[in-house]
Structure formats: structure tokens, C-alpha cells
């Protein structure tokens, strides 16, 4: 018996389809697809969520110095004129240094994040901003399932598809 369903496609196409379905599931919370694809996506999604739940709180915080340009009331950079050694004048942007707290992944969480990212595509929202689905998985989805042992997804049968009568299902995060 094969480890994964073949889905009637070559390996590269099959992985691309599964990767896009897993990405859509984590981005939207639910997907509508055929039963065979849904069973494969469910298997992959359950494993990724289990990894994220295990490594959910495995990070440290550290202080980082951040340099940023000073802005005036209109949002423009504040500049000063300086003279070089040979007498030329040039503009220099004023900068301010702040210290911010930044989260740093521990090695096992970093490995888990990279495993998860291997199954997710980069996606953008309607305004064109990039959404980091790995962050969403570790920061929003995994904490909801902290006390749950498996069963993170649910499948509903919605009947056969018109045209080829393939059994269609809705796969959603519980």
C-alpha cells in the first residue's frame, strides 16, 4: 500500500496540488475539494498542526537595537547638511536608536517552522501584503489546540460534483 494517494498525477504535480490545498486551508480555515484530496490534505495538516502545538511556546525574547530615520510631522525624513573633508556639502538623514524586544526561536522551534514552511506557499492578502502562514499557524492556530490531542480538522460530505460525480467534501479546521 502506498504511503500517499497518487491522485492520478505525477509526483511534482501531486505535491503542488497538496501544497496549495494545505496553504488554502490554513489561510481560509476551510476548503472545498474531492474526498481523496481532502484525506491527504487532512493527514498533512494534522501533522503540521501537531508540530506547531508542540513547539508553540518554545522561544525566547531579546533586546535588539533598531535604527530608524527621524520623521517630521508630514512623514518626511529630517536631514542635516554636512561638509566633507574636501569642502563639498551633502545631506545626512538624522537617525534615532530604539531598543525593541524581539522573539527568537529556539533551535527545535526553528526546525519545526522550516518543516511547516516546506508545505506552505507564500500568499498575499487582498491589499497585496504578504501573509506569513507559518506565523499564523504558530501564533494563532496552534494555541487554540494546546490541550487537544489530534482531531484538528473536520470533513463534511456535500455530495457528488456535477460533471464527473466525484464525491466532494468541505475540510475545515475545528
From Swiss-Prot:
Listed under GO cellular component are: cytosolic large ribosomal subunit
GO biological process entries = translation
Q: Which GO terms describe its molecular function?
A: structural constituent of ribosome
**Keyword field:** Ribonucleoprotein, Ribosomal protein
Q: How does it assemble?
A: Part of the 50S ribosomal subunit. Contacts protein L32.
Q: List the coiled-coil residues.
A: none
Annotated protein name in UniProt: Large ribosomal subunit protein bL17
What is the similarity comment for this entry? Belongs to the bacterial ribosomal protein bL17 family.
The gene designation is rplQ
Amino acid at each position: 500500500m502506498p504511503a500517499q494517494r497518487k491522485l492520478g498525477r505525477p509526483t511534482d504535480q501531486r505535491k503542488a496540488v497538496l501544497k496549495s490545498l494545505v496553504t488554502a486551508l490554513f489561510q481560509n480555515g476551510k476548503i472545498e475539494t474531492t474526498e481523496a484530496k481532502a484525506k491527504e490534505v487532512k493527514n498533512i495538516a494534522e501533522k503540521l498542526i501537531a508540530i506547531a502545538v508542540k513547539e508553540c511556546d518554545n522561544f525566547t525574547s531579546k533586546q535588539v537595537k533598531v535604527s530608524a530615520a527621524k520623521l517630521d510631522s508630514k512623514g518626511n525624513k529630517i536631514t542635516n547638511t554636512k561638509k566633507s573633508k574636501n569642502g563639498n556639502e551633502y545631506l545626512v538623514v538624522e537617525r534615532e536608536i530604539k531598543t525593541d524586544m524581539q522573539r527568537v526561536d529556539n533551535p527545535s522551534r526553528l526546525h519545526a517552522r522550516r518543516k511547516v514552511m516546506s508545505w506552505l506557499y507564500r500568499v498575499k492578502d487582498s491589499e497585496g501584503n504578504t501573509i506569513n502562514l507559518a506565523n499564523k499557524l504558530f501564533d494563532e492556530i496552534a494555541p487554540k489546540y494546546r490541550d487537544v490531542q489530534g482531531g484538528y480538522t473536520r470533513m463534511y460530505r456535500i455530495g457528488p460534483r456535477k460533471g464527473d460525480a466525484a464525491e466532494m467534501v468541505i475540510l475545515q479546521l475545528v
